């Protein structure tokens, strides 16, 4: 190859990612929508585990359904305030947030889990190697799109495996051991 062409070739590192559902994984699940800062309570061990995953060179990407927006229960600004709070508390450790604001009662969306569009967008944006990546969720619908795309799946809070979970952990502190770190 001629030296004059060498600068035209760009080599991209394939990134590994850790996808996380939000409510019930990062912050306390309330049973209703979490959109007020006073209700956005980061669960124990979350920040330590995220820091360790970052040290292991994982991209950290939150994938969350936020149907309360389309139902008029809260605004994107309120949701973003919760995400900004998480970033402040974690020293900006999350690489990106993907959210699906629609609810089936209002409008169908391929972004909304269990569909996979939010994952596909992140994979394309960050050149993610799905075979080296993980998704953690507390519901089967969190795991379905990841499994469809070849991402290893972890269910949290369940003592038994579902057909969509590759790993099962009691709480987030068990994630690193489950995946061999």
Predicted regions span which residues?
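Active-site neighborhood of HAD-like aspartate-dependent phosphohydrolases
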Residues: 11-59
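Substrate-recognition element of Asp-dependent hydrolases with the DxDx(T/V) motif
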Residues: 50-83, 94-103
């Amino acid at each position: 190859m001629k030296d004059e062409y060498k600068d035209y070739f760009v080599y991209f590192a394939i990134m590994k990612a850790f996808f996380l559902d939000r409510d019930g994984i990062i912050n306390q699940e309330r049973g209703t929508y979490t959109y007020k800062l006073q209700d956005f309570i980061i669960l124990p061990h979350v920040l330590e585990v995220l820091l360790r995953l970052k040290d292991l060179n994982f991209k950290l990407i939150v994938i969350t359904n936020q149907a309360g927006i389309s139902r008029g229960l809260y605004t994107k600004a309120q949701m973003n305030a919760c995400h900004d709070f998480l970033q402040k508390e974690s020293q900006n450790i999350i690489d990106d947030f993907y959210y699906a604001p629609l609810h089936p009662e209002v409008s169908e969306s391929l972004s909304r889990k269990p569909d996979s569009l939010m994952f596909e967008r992140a994979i394309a944006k960050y050149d993610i190697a799905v075979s080296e990546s993980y998704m953690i969720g507390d519901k089967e619908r969190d795991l379905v799109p990841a499994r469809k795309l070849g991402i290893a799946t972890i269910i949290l809070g369940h003592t038994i495996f579902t057909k969509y979970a590759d790993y099962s952990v009691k709480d987030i502190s068990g994630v690193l051991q489950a995946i061999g770190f």
